[in-house]
């Protein structure tokens, strides 16, 4: 079993930079306006509006308005009058000295969970690497202060659409879940018939097969529609690159997390038009 188990999304977490550079934890400080009326959670997308930081809902794209990812803040607590360091900005806090910490490097690589809808964990796949994804905008957790934003699992071929906010850089093998195997029977277009699945397949599940010599053969495809345990068929997003062999052993792997970066043109530092 994979460890740790990923049971809910947590926004975007910086891990390194493209080109193998190390993320040193460096952030840029921006102000949040007095009594700004929206919660901002750790891992949320943020933008600048008239010099102040605001949370921004990101689903299909932002066209050069993002300034980065929110990583906490500090402000004078209006009740205790003491400096408070917080994982998130509570909406409508009557503080005018808030400093937010933002991961603003456009080349940052982030780790994020992928969901089919809301906060339902799905799967990434090898076939998604190099492609673009949309995001799911969810309300964060005020108990932990963490974001609940997620990557949106595609139900078809991952998009090449330039307006989508996220580029997939890689899988996170440390949290991969080996779902098991089934015996291949036949395929019609992208619908695969097999022995009864002893497990459910979430959207995005990576599918491969075993060659006669025991080597793993990636299909270049993933599960398009969630399949229930006991099902004798499932649907791929497209036909496999290499046809499954007769009675081949099909191998199913769930990757609940992906490595991603902001797609080109999403970050305001790489946009010619300044924010209003």
Residue ranges of model-derived segments:
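Disulfide-bonded cysteine-rich modules in secreted/extracellular proteins
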Residues: 177-189
């Amino acid at each position: 079993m994979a460890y740790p188990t990923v049971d809910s999304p947590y926004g975007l977490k910086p891990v390194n930079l493209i080109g193998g550079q190390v993320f040193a934890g460096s952030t840029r400080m921006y102000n949040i306006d007095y009594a700004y009326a929206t919660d901002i959670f750790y891992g949320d997308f943020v933008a600048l509006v008239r010099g102040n930081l605001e949370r921004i809902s990101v689903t299909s794209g932002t066209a050069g308005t993002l300034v980065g990812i929110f990583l906490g803040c500090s402000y004078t607590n209006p009740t205790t009058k003491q400096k408070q360091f917080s994982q998130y900005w509570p909406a409508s806090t009557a503080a005018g000295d808030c400093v937010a910490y933002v991961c603003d490097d456009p080349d940052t690589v982030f780790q994020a969970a992928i969901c089919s809808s809301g906060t339902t964990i799905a799967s990434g796949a090898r076939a998604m690497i190099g492609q673009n994804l949309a995001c799911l905008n969810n309300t964060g957790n005020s108990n932990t202060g963490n974001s609940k934003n997620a990557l949106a699992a595609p139900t078809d071929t991952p998009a090449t659409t330039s307006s989508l906010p996220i580029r997939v850089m890689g899988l996170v093998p440390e949290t991969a879940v080996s779902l098991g195997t089934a015996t291949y029977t036949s395929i019609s277009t992208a619908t695969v018939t097999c022995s009864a699945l002893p497990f459910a397949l979430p959207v995005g599940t990576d599918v491969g097969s075993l060659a006669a010599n025991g080597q793993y053969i990636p299909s270049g495809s993933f599960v398009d529609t969630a399949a229930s345990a006991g099902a004798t068929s499932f649907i791929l997003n497209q036909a496999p690159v290499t046809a499954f062999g007769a009675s081949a052993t099909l191998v199913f792997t769930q990757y609940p997390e992906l490595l991603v970066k902001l797609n080109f043109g999403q970050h305001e530092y790489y946009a010619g038009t300044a924010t209003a």
